[in-house]
């Protein structure tokens, strides 16, 4: 389906396909471009937590809401390296660092640049998510050796206005442009289950599809309703709708890595297995996802074994029991 001129109507038709027919098409596409036994493992660390000035309705790190998140200033290089070493020992391929900023403060960015250089020296791929970037900041990250920059669109432009008011959709597009122009791989996806419609989910995929280049990796998050945020009582997305969205993401983006991201802690092994068959071929690996719970490494390893996928070897020192 590469090169297809997708629009709302044509993507909507995919959603109307019988479930197994849609998954069959997605799995065929996946097999054509990837080793179906391979699962890309990434670890995500919160290097600066809380007091974010943005008002993203889903986020417990926003300074606008009273949540249980403990505020923490930018952690030091030694702490980052210790986490990265543990991640590598346990089979992670990429180490991602997230900071709750609107954009990286001038006084803090040099510290992050040093983190990138040091983590890469361990033999890991690097990814950061630091908020909005101007062109100069993106070039500095590239010079430090950054491999990926994560900046999600979150949802459709229409629904976005109900979720965030402190940063525009165009602000996000501008950051993605600066990242691309700097020669950094783009990691960009969204969040499902915030109360959006199917049309919103379709439009999110079309916004990603219409970027000058497809994102190298596409994280698909399921909302984790956090107490104290405006979305704490939001009804969960239907599991079949979630799986279908992943399958359609695979059809629109045959060569992108699709990461099953936030929300896995609440997913059954069976639901995750369906997501993998639909085309998801990456997970965040480790018992924490920024400030949210994530399945323990043993649970993930056991699931990968059950499914006959490639399994990392846990060291006895770092295994999670």
Swiss-Prot record:
Domain Radical SAM core: 37-264
Pathway participation: Cofactor biosynthesis; biotin biosynthesis; biotin from 7,8-diaminononanoate: step 2/2
An annotated GO BP: biotin biosynthetic process
Classification via CDD domains: Radical_SAM (cd01335)
Catalytic reaction annotation: (4R,5S)-dethiobiotin + (sulfur carrier)-SH + 2 reduced [2Fe-2S]-[ferredoxin] + 2 S-adenosyl-L-methionine = (sulfur carrier)-H + biotin + 2 5'-deoxyadenosine + 2 L-methionine + 2 oxidized [2Fe-2S]-[ferredoxin]
Enzyme Commission number, as recorded: 2.8.1.6
InterPro entries, per the entry: Aldolase_TIM (IPR013785), BATS_dom (IPR010722), Biotin_synth/BioAB (IPR002684), Biotin_synthase (IPR024177), Elp3/MiaA/NifB-like_rSAM (IPR006638), rSAM (IPR007197)
Binding site for [4Fe-4S] cluster: 52, 56, 59
Keywords annotated in UniProt: 2Fe-2S, 4Fe-4S, Biotin biosynthesis, Iron, Iron-sulfur, Metal-binding, S-adenosyl-L-methionine, Transferase
Gene Ontology MF terms: 2 iron, 2 sulfur cluster binding; 4 iron, 4 sulfur cluster binding; biotin synthase activity; iron ion binding
Binding site for [2Fe-2S] cluster: 96, 127, 187, 259
Protein's name according to its UniProt entry: Biotin synthase
Protein encoded by which gene: bioB
């Amino acid at each position: 389906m590469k090169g297809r001129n997708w629009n709302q109507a044509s993507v909507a038709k995919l959603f109307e396909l019988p479930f197994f027919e849609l998954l069959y098409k997605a799995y065929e596409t996946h097999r054509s471009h990837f080793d179906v036994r391979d699962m890309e493992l990434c670890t995500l660390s919160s290097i600066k937590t809380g007091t974010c000035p943005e008002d993203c309705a889903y986020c417990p790190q926003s300074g606008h809401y009273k949540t249980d998140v403990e505020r923490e200033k930018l952690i030091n290089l030694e702490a980052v390296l210790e986490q990265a070493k543990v991640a590598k020992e346990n089979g992670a391929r990429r180490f991602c660092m997230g900071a709750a900023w609107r954009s990286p403060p001038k006084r803090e960015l040099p510290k992050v640049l040093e983190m990138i250089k040091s983590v890469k020296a361990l033999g890991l791929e690097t990814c950061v998510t630091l908020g909005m970037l101007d062109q100069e900041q993106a070039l500095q990250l590239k010079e430090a050796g950054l491999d990926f920059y994560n900046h999600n669109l979150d949802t459709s432009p229409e629904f976005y206005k109900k979720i965030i008011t402190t940063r525009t959709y165009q602000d996000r597009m501008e950051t993605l442009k600066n990242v691309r122009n700097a020669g950094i791989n783009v990691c960009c996806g969204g969040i499902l289950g915030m109360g959006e419609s199917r049309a919103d989910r379709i439009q999110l995929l079309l916004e990603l599809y219409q970027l000058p280049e497809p994102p190298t990796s596409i994280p698909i998050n399921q909302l984790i309703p956090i107490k104290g945020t405006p979305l704490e009582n939001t009804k969960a997305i239907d599991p079949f709708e979630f799986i279908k969205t992943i399958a359609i993401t695979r059809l629109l983006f045959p060569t992108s890595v699709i990461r099953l991201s936030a929300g896995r802690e609440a997913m059954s092994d069976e639901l995750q297995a369906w997501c993998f068959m639909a085309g998801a071929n990456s997970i965040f690996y480790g018992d924490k996802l920024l400030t949210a719970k994530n399945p323990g490494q043993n649970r993930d390893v056991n699931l990968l074994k059950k499914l006959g996928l490639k399994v990392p070897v846990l060291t006895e020192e770092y295994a999670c029991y």
